[in-house]
Amino acid sequence: MSSPRSNKPKIVNGPGGYILQDVPHLIDYLPDLPTYPNPLQDNPAYSVVKQYFVHADDSVPEKVVVHKDGPRGVHFRRAGPRQKVYFESDEVHACIVTCGGLCPGLNTVIREVVSSLSYMYGVKRILGIDGGYRGFYAKNTIPLNSKVVNDIHKRGGTIIGTSRGGHDTNKIVDSIQDRGINQVYIIGGDGTQRGASVIFEEIRRRRLKVAVVGIPKTIDNDIPVIDKSFGFDTAVEEAQRAINAAHVEAESNENGIGFVKLMGRYSGYIAMYATLASRDVDCCLIPESPFYLEGEGGLFEFIERRLKDHGHMVIVLAEGAGQDLMCKSMESTPMDASGNKLLKDVGLWLSQSIKDHFKKNKMVMNLKYIDPTYMIRAVPSNASDNVYCTLLAQSAVHGAMAGYTGYTSGLVNGRQTYIPFYRITETQNNVVITDRMWARLLSSTNQPSFLGPKDTSEEKKELPETPLLDDGAVDIPPVTKEVTK
């Protein structure tokens, strides 16, 4: 028996600086697999669609704005149905697992994976893995069909349960092999996708005909490459309720301060977009933008000035902001089961610090602290996220049926793509505070940047020079393997 091909990333180079960061395929290590006509050819719902099947050479650029003399840059394989599939309908035994924290849209993704497998490809055997990764070997499975998932998109949470941690690669793959599962749909954040990548590598090592597909989920919107993560729009919309309440409280009291803490462990996207959407916020604090409390240009001085000028203000704080002010080192901070640092409650600490400052200076102030952290992630997804979840799920199913594996289904520049796991797990998506979007926020709130010239210059130095233009930093990983096409 021949050994599997190299596990290095699949890179295809083309003219004009074209780079395709391709995803693995079952035939990479099982070259003799038969193909079958796609059942969608006989599906009346798609008979009127012209060019419904995606061309094998279609790809989507990672960056759409380029210099006229610059390279074409990195591309990803376009998602969608192929004319040939590598699984027969009766052969498919699929499973779905959700891991990590809750996020609006989880049930919608589950529903659409089941519906796509059932209605598009005639698949009958679909299982839900109960309670995250450990459910593969520690719990019973949940049979899923179109009747079971019919209206679950109207509910928050996940009907198959979730958990953090519990990743035991050998036990998980043993369970997949023993149950005869050949399509695995894994819904979760960056840690979950890293686990999915390890599962895929073990499945490839065992040379199993099993497609492993990731669907990226994080309410913080901190997964790289993709335009946004599902549930983010809903979270921003739901955060408006808390901000509106804070604004009402602040306006109704002398020197009133409405203080809202939102999710955002390392990335401040929810706080930033909720602030921009609200237009009632006077100060937004995020992990990426350091700030200080005392002295000229500090937060306390800004609060005093804003209260003097307007008589009230609203502060929005991401949960990961200001952690350095609470403790000198994060090294001793405990971890949760997924390996994430358990952050201290900076919201309570900062609100108390503001109260103490005003009391010390004998100034009247009324602060109302609102923490909707878990409320914004436990709600059903809104209309926009429901549509997005549908597209993600359908694209994931099309890719698995076409034999692709070891990839994440994601939206890049408005197009559905297949992204190799290593691009999703290699870094984290953060707000770039020298970017136009952060400048728009500062213009909206009229808050200081809390950065000196030195901080700004250092931030800009961190951004790599590249002929590709974008609002944020661009990072094209080096080509590690060349495949001539």
Swiss-Prot record:
Tissue-wise expression:
Expressed in roots, leaves, stems and flowers.
Query: What one GO molecular function would you report for this record?
Result: metal ion binding
Major localization listed first in the record, in broad terms? cytoplasm
The metabolic or biological pathway listed in the UniProt record of this protein is:
Carbohydrate degradation; glycolysis; D-glyceraldehyde 3-phosphate and glycerone phosphate from D-glucose: step 3/4
Transmembrane regions listed in the UniProt entry? none
Query: Where Mg(2+) is bound, by residue?
Result: 190
Q: Where is this site: Important for substrate specificity?
A: 191
Q: What class of enzyme is it?
A: transferase
Q: Which residues bind substrate?
A: 218-220, 263-265, 319, 374-377
| One matching Pfam family | PFK
Q: Does the keyword ATP-binding apply?
A: yes
Q: What is its EC number?
A: 2.7.1.11
Q: Which GO terms describe its biological process?
A: fructose 6-phosphate metabolic process; glycolytic process
The answer to whether the entry has keyword Glycoprotein is no
Q: Which UniProt keywords apply?
A: Allosteric enzyme, ATP-binding, Cytoplasm, Glycolysis, Kinase, Magnesium, Metal-binding, Nucleotide-binding, Transferase
Identify the InterPro entries for this entry.
ATP_PFK, PFKA, Phosphofructokinase_dom, PKF_sf, PyroP-dep_PFK_TP0108
Q: Which domain of life is it from?
A: Eukaryota
The record, for HAMAP family, names: Phosphofructokinase_II_X
Q: How does this protein assemble?
A: Homotetramer.
Main role?
Catalyzes the phosphorylation of D-fructose 6-phosphate to fructose 1,6-bisphosphate by ATP, the first committing step of glycolysis.
Q: What is the recorded name of this protein?
A: ATP-dependent 6-phosphofructokinase 7
